[in-house]
Structures are given as C-alpha cells and as structure tokens.
Design a protein with these regions (language model features):
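N-terminal extracellular ligand-recognition/capping segment immediately after the signal peptide
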Residues: 319-323, 332-355, 359-362
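Predominantly extracellular beta-rich ligand-binding scaffolds that present long acidic/polar faces
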Residues: 351, 419, 446, 455, ...
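Surface beta-loop-beta hairpin patches that serve as ligand-binding interfaces in beta-rich domains
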Residues: 308, 686-742
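N-terminal, active-site-proximal structural segment of metallo-dependent hydrolase catalytic domains
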Residues: 23-95, 107, 112, 265, ...
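Right-handed parallel beta-helix/beta-spiral solenoid domain characteristic of secreted/periplasmic
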Residues: 353-405, 429
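C-terminal outer-membrane/trafficking sorting elements
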Residues: 744-805
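Structured beta-strand-rich core segments of catalytic domains in phosphoester-bond hydrolases
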Residues: 76-171, 283
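Metal-dependent phosphoester-hydrolase catalytic domains
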Residues: 185, 189, 199-208, 215-309
C-alpha cells in the first residue's frame, strides 16, 4: 500500500499549530454558516492585527478549514480598499476562495457595503436569486423607516438564492441579511417584512436564513417575527465551541474565546424550516493570533434534507396524565383530553409548541363537549415562553389568578402564535393587566370563544392583546368583565386588527370602553364588522377625569397611531351603553364610542340610546365622539338616536332597547334582564326609512383590506350569525329575516314601531301601511286606525301614524 507521507506531514503540521483539519463530512450533510467579517475601518481605530490585510487570511482559512458549503457574509466592503493590499474585502474573498462562487448585493448602490453569499460551485447549482430592501418599499433602495428617528444611515437588504443540491437534486433557499441595530422601530418592522416576504417566497421549500440580526432573543417583538415563520437552530440543536472556549455569545470584541475580555451579544442567528439541523458550532478559531479574526465569531450549522419527525399525540383522562404528557411532549405535539374536569395546583409551562384538544369521549373517537381546566390555587393555568406557540380547542379555563407585572389570570403567552377555538375563560382575575388572557404574540387568532366574569386592575378585564402582526377575533362573546381600561379587551399594537361577529355586553370600565384599541404601529389598520356593543358602562372614578381627556366610549374607545391609519366600523350595533363621569365633562366623549385618532369610516351602524352624564346631572344623548367627524359621516349610512329616543332615567336607556328587540337583533346569548319593562318608542323613523328606501345600504361600496395586501374585499355579505344579508340590508349587526325583498311605498317621514304582547292601535291619515324591516307589507288599512295585535312581536315600519293604547 502506498503511503502519502506529504499528506501525513501536512496533517501533523496543522495539528501541532492548533488547527483542526476539516474532516470528511458524512454524505447528505450540508454545512451552512453566517459570518460578519467586520468592514474595513482603518480610519476608526482598526489598526495592527485588526487591519484587514492582517486578518484576511484567517477569515478565509476558517471558511476552508471548517469546510463551509455555503456562508452568508455581512459587512463586506466593496470600494473601501485596504491601504496595504490595495483590494477591497469583496475582491479578496473572491481571490482567496477560488472553490466558491458568490452572489453579492451592495446595499446602497455605491459599491460600499455588501451582504455576500459564497457557495461551493461544485456542490450546488443556482436556480434563481434575488433581493429586497428592508424598508416601506422593498423594491426601492432607501433607509428603513428612518422617520421614526432611528440612529441609522445605512440601507438594509436581504439576499436569497434558490439552490439545487447536485447530489440529491433537492432544491432549497439560502438567504442572508444584516438587520438594523435600532430595535425601537425599524428593527421590528424590518423583521416583520423579512419573515413575511421570505415565507411568501419559499412556501414549503426548505429554507435557511442567516445573518447578523442585531437582536437578542429578549427583544421579543423583533425575534418573534422570525419565530412566527421559522425555527431558531440554536433552540433545536446542541451548541459547541470549536475548537476552544465555552461561550454562548457570538460577538468577540476582538478577543479570543478563552480570553476573559471576550464578550458580546448573540446577534448571529440561523433560522430554518423544512430541513433538519444536526449540530451548531460557534467557530472560535483564531490561529493562535491572540486576537479574533473579526469582532463576530462565525456560526456553523450542519443540516440534512430529510423528513421532519412526525408530531406525537397523547390521550389523557386525568390531571396526572395531562402533566406527564406535557413533560414528555416535543415540538408541535398534540394532547387530547377526555371530557371532564382537571383540577390543577400548578401552572402548565410547556417548553415547546403544543396543541391541546379537549372534550373527547372516553374512547377518544369524537368530541362530545369540553374539558375544564380549573386552578385550585391562585395561579395561572398556562404560561408559555416567548419562543413557542399554543393552540387550544374545546377547553374551559377557570378560576385563575395572576400577580405578575404582565398579568394573564388564566393564560400568559410571550410566544410566537396563539390560536383559540371554542374555549371559555371565566372567573379569573389579575392584580395588573389581563384578567384572563395576556397575549404578547406575533399573531393571535380567537374564534367562537367566551370570556366572562374576568377582572383586572389596569388594562384588559378579560384580554390584554399585544400583537405584532395580526389579531383576529371572530364569533366570540365578552360579558360581565371589568377593568379600568378595556373592560373586556385591551388591544395594544398590531398591524392588522380584524374583529368580526362578536358580542360585548354588560362590561364595566372606569376610563375607556369595553373594547379599547391603541394601535401604535405605523401601518396599523382596524376593521370591526358585525359586532354588538350592548349595555356596557363606563363609571369613572373620582379624580381620573381631570387627569386626561382620553376618556369615553363605554362600548368602544380607539386611538390609532396617526390620522392616516384606517379604522373601519361596519354593521355594528351600539345600544344602551352609557358613561357616568366625575369632574369636567369636557374630558369625556361618547356614550357608545370614542375614536380619538385615526382615519375613520363607518357604514350601516346602529347607534341608539347611548348616553353620558355627570354624577350630579341627568343623562343626555351622546352616541359618539369621533375625530374628523365631517369626513367620517360623509356618504355613509348610519342610524343614530334622535332626541325622542332619550330616556329620562338610567334604566330606561337599556330597557327601551332591550324591550324593543327582545334580544333578536343581537345574539342568542344576550339574555333579557328580568327587570326590563317592554316599551314602545318611536326611534328616528325619518332616518331609518330614508336610508332604507334611498341609500339601499350598499355593502359593495365598503370593503376591507384585512390582510394588508392592498386589495379590498367585501366582508358584509353575512350578518353577525352568518346569515346571508339581503341586497337591501338592515343596519346593525343582525338583519331581520322576514323574507321580503323591497320597499316601494314607505315615505321618509315614516317611523319605526315596536309591537309586543300589548294591543296597540295606530291612528293617523287614511291608508296606513305596515312593513317589516325587510320591506314586506304585512298590514294595510284604508281606515285611520289599524290593530297591530295580530302581528308577531318585533319591529315594523309604519307610515302616517300616532300611537294609542
């Protein structure tokens, strides 16, 4: 056998020098790295061994010695040539890494600073490539959200390549970015843009995103954007230092990893999806130079293209089995719970993303009800760390409590995504925020849930939602909750708020509505469709009213970030909400709703018998206080109270409306209070008939851009209980379903009349005609009187009438 002594001698030489020669990698493994190599900066203190001329060999040797298949470089200078070599960093990398080809994009069009992807040209074929700028207009060079005052004057980009692995023919994406170091605004918005656009680009194709992200994992809003779409390799592999040191940060501060002065942040990440990470290494090689080759260490992750492990499922019938399943569960597993009650004396704290599905029969063959998770102690039921997601189906969480600064009496999540379906959160409390649910997530989705009898001290009697991207709440009920601000729901932030087909009733706040929305994002938009706000109260505490003018809106209070942000309200009912304030009346506004700031548009809403009063005065009609009212009400169709509809005392405000509709106009769950006295009142008949006959309540003219893609869609086809609306729809959250098609004879002066079990006689001019609210003629007479008692209880349009008993 022939022995190659030169190769042995070379390997021994490397070992003696402290350099580990690259070992042959197993087949099918791909070695991907990220490396910020520090730009040429001789004018600002980079001298001696920090000069690029004195470290370029170490930088490129790391790439070769540690056998990087693909590496994403950051801070690669193009036109700023080293004074000793006469070359730019980019040219040196090209010359010194001949086995690699590259895709390098300059960030500002000035040949100054690049993100550069270098890849082994023998191992991969480029199928496609591209880039975008990290700003409000990704196809155009420019600074990222600079008008937010970021201390940053460098444009940021993301570069991507669609590769084909020559051995397996597998296609995958590799992307590289260098994020803004100002996290106050553009870091957050840039992260959202990168994560969203990269997901749209790659779909379900394997992808690895590397770079210097200038963030810690504790920077929740920024980090959560990436975690909402991808996985962090550091959390799903074991990290080692190669060849020396015991550090977790990736910044070096120029010191070797074994030096006590070696310090820095973990700014360098690899995010991935649909590919399996095998190991992660912080490459601490310095070639015995007593100085690191850059102020960042490169990070290497070994990947393999293989099927990701299938999630495991668990079936539990009691509390002990539930806790064991949570302890055993791995990423994206599902735990199925049999119907029944599970008493807890500790908080469930998963360290992975999980789904819980309750309500199964004993054979786990079908969902037959719900599973109740009840706290015996004054603790939360769930607490989810910032990295993970949670999905709940068919659960009733009850009797929780929180004293933490964030709150969340039953559930607190600082994670990526929260999804709730057919769940109930009840009888919980918090000494701070969020009596039931604290949701600090990238996305939150709530459907067909109930939040009742939950209280908090500060904000969000039931929910405090602090979403980065989207908050969607559909078909849910909020009742008998209480808090200073946002008696039922307090929303802080969110790019898209979509609140449809919900009921907010009998909630009590002390400052701002049952629903309070404070949207602090630059591009936020809020859409409220088919919601009912009934009998909510704002009872101000003494002393509060003189401190600020941000009071009012017992049903809804909203304040967008600026006057250009959209706030759309359509087919909503605001009825019987009222405000009692102490102190200066000018500090309050709106018995039903107050929109303090935003570009508002309202269409086809019902605002009736809402009022406000000082503690020592009578109620007076105030349905709303809205900024920019002239623009708001132009060419819209909303039915407001008239002076005749104002009750003389508090109970009449609610009793009148509750009696009129007897629950039918809202939701089946809104129960009539036994103390209500059914009354008959004429409610602004001129407006109602005028709208019905002339404006036709055209839903087609009012669309929403729910997902923020710039395309408006019509979300008014269905009413609050998902019945298809007639072409000539009724105002408010629910449409009457008497089956008629048109109104042809009703005149603008006609009124709306309640008929109940009492016998009412109408008298007036001859030819009295009675219509239901869908426009069908149900009674007519050539006489001056007509007996309404044969009609079912309900609302009717009657022309030329007076009322007698």
């Amino acid at each position: 056998m022939r022995v190659d002594f030169l190769k042995i001698l070379f390997a021994l030489t490397l070992t003696i020098a402290g350099i580990a020669p690259a070992m042959a990698e197993e087949p099918g493994v791909h070695r991907f790295a990220t490396y910020n190599i520090r730009y040429v900066n001789a004018n600002n203190g980079d001298t001696g061994d920090k000069l690029w001329a004195n470290r370029r060999t170490a930088v490129t040797n790391i790439v070769k010695d540690y056998d990087f298949d693909i590496v994403g470089f950051q801070e690669v200078t193009g036109n700023n040539k080293d004074s000793q070599t006469g070359k730019s960093q980019l040219q040196d990398l090209i010359d010194m890494l001949p086995a690699y080809d590259n895709y390098a994009v300059e960030r500002e069009g000035k040949n100054y600073s690049y993100n550069a992807i270098f890849y082994k040209k023998s191992k991969y074929t480029v199928v496609d490539k591209g880039m975008w700028y990290i700003n409000e207009h990704p196809s155009t060079p420019g600074l990222s959200w600079k008008y937010f005052g970021d201390a940053n004057t460098i444009a940021r980009t993301l570069e991507w390549i669609l590769f084909r692995d020559n051995a397996s023919q597998t296609e995958f994406y590799f992307a590289c970015t260098h994020m803004n170091y100002s996290l106050a605004s553009s870091g957050v918005y840039g992260a959202e843009l990168n994560a969203r656009m990269l997901r749209e680009l790659v779909g379900e194709t394997p992808v690895v995103l590397v770079g210097d992200f200038n963030m810690h994992r504790s920077h929740e809003d920024t980090y959560r954007n990436y975690m909402s779409q991808f996985y962090d390799a550091a959390l799903h592999t074991t990290t080692t230092c190669n060849p020396k040191g015991n550090i977790t940060h990736t910044g070096s501060n120029w010191y070797p990893a074994t030096n006590a002065n070696c310090s820095g942040s973990e700014f360098d990440y690899q995010f991935y999806d649909n590919i399996v990470p095998l190991s992660r290494e912080i490459i601490t090689e310095d070639y015995n130079r007593a100085i690191a080759p850059s102020d960042h260490f490169p990070v290497l992750v070994r990947y393999k293209f293989q099927d990701t492990p299938s999630p495991t499922s668990y079936q539990v019938t009691n509390t002990d089995e539930l806790l064991v399943a949570v302890a055993k569960a791995t990423m994206n597993d599902t735990i199925y719970l049999a119907q029944g009650e599970y008493e807890l004396d500790a908080t469930i704290q998963p360290t992975v993303s999980l789904t819980f599905v309750g309500g199964y029969d004993k054979q786990f063959s079908d969902v037959v009800g719900v599973s109740k998770l009840r706290q015996k102690e004054a603790k939360q039921v769930f607490n989810i760390p910032q990295y993970y997601s949670l999905t709940l189906y068919n659960l009733h969480l009850e009797n929780g409590s929180s004293t933490s600064a964030l709150g969340g009496g039953l559930l607190a999540i600082n994670g990526s995504k929260l999804n709730l379906y057919n769940c109930r959160f009840s009888n919980s409390q918090s000494t701070t925020n969020a009596g039931a649910l604290y949701a600090n997530t990238h996305d939150t989705y709530i459907e067909n849930c109930v939040f009742d009898n939950d209280t908090a001290k500060t904000s969000g009697g039931a929910i405090y939602a602090e979403t980065m991207e989207s908050l969607t709440i559909i078909d849910s009920k909020f009742h008998h909750n209480g808090c200073t601000t946002g008696a039922a729901l307090y929303v802080n932030g969110g790019r898209v708020l979509n609140i449809q087909c919900n009921g907010f009733y009998d909630n009590i706040s002390n400052k701002q509505g049952a629903l309070t929305i404070v949207a602090d994002q630059y591009s936020a938009a809020a859409h409220l469709v088919n919601n009912s706000f009934l009998n909510n109260q704002l009872i101000a505490k003494k002393g509060l009213a003189t401190a600020t003018k941000d009071f009012g809106g017992a049903g809804l209070y909203a304040k967008m970030n600026n006057d250009t942000q959209l706030f759309n309200i359509a087919h909503c009912s605001f009825i019987g909400n009222h405000t009692v304030f102490a102190g200066t009346k000018a500090n309050f506004g709106g018995g039903a709703l107050r929109i303090a700031q935003g570009k508002s548009c309202m269409m086809n809403n019902l605002l009736l018998a809402n009022a406000e009063k000082a503690s020592d005065t009578e109620y007076e009609y105030v349905d709303y206080t809205i900024a920019n009212a002239e623009t708001l009400w132009r060419n819209t169709e909303n039915l407001l109270s008239s002076s005749e509809s104002i009750a003389d005392w508090e109970n009449d405000l609610v009793n009148t409306i509750a009696g009129l509709w007897n629950g039918k106009v809202f939701t089946a769950d809104v129960r009539e209070n036994g103390t209500y006295v059914l009354k008959s009142k004429m409610l602004n008949g001129f407006n109602l008939c005028y709208l019905t006959t002339n404006h036709r309540l055209c839903e087609s003219a009012f669309g929403f851009d729910i997902d923020g893609d710039g395309n408006k869609s019509n979300y008014l086809k269905y009413d609050q209980i998902h019945n298809t609306r007639a072409i000539k729809a009724c105002v408010g959250a629910l449409e009457y379903k008497e089956g008629a098609t048109s109104i042809t004879e009703v005149q603008p002066q006609d009124g709306i009349q309640q008929v109940d079990e009492h016998q009412y006689i109408l008298t007036g001019a001859p030819n009295v005609t009675v219509y239901n609210l869908a426009g069908q003629c149900v009674l007519s007479s050539n006489n001056e009187t007509i007996d309404l008692s044969p009609l079912p209880s309900g609302l009717y349009i009657v022309n030329q009438h007076k009322i007698i008993r």
